Amino acid sequence: MDGIKYAVFTDKSIRLLGKNQYTSNVESGSTRTEIKHWVELFFGVKVIAMNSHRLPGKGRRMGPIMGQTMHYRRMIITLQPGYSIPPLRKKRT
């Protein structure tokens, strides 16, 4: 399982960094428990809470045919005080 796809940097997610909460998009079929264990093992941190929501796909037009992109899941991970995750940066091309 890949776990986290990439970190999300929006106005809200940057504001949540001050509360030791990290926002990222994760695999759509993964559960909270899987992501929690993956984050704790990979980053060596203690997770105290996780909030998740599924964002809908967007409509995309391909000529006369209207298509739909895949939905995705976003997790807000709250860590215990004293722990932090280095920023997950997406490679710019």
Swiss-Prot record:
Keyword Zinc applies: no
GO biological process: translation
Described purpose of this protein according to its UniProt entry: Binds to 23S rRNA.
Assembly and oligomerization: Part of the 50S ribosomal subunit.
Matches recorded under HAMAP family: Ribosomal_uL23_B
Phylogenetic placement of the source organism: Eukaryota, Viridiplantae, Streptophyta, Embryophyta, Tracheophyta
Main localization (coarse): plastid
GO molecular function: mRNA binding; rRNA binding; structural constituent of ribosome
Family per similarity comment: Belongs to the universal ribosomal protein uL23 family.
GO cellular component labels: chloroplast; ribonucleoprotein complex; ribosome
Keywords assigned by UniProt, alphabetized: Chloroplast, Plastid, Ribonucleoprotein, Ribosomal protein, RNA-binding, rRNA-binding
Signal sequence annotation: none
Protein name: Large ribosomal subunit protein uL23cz/uL23cy
Location within or outside the cell: Plastid, Chloroplast
Repressor recorded as keyword: no
Record InterPro entries: Nucleotide-bd_a/b_plait_sf, Ribosomal_uL23-like, Ribosomal_uL23/eL15/eS24_sf, Ribosomal_uL23_CS
Family annotation (SUPFAM superfamilies): Ribosomal proteins S24e, L23 and L15e (SSF54189)
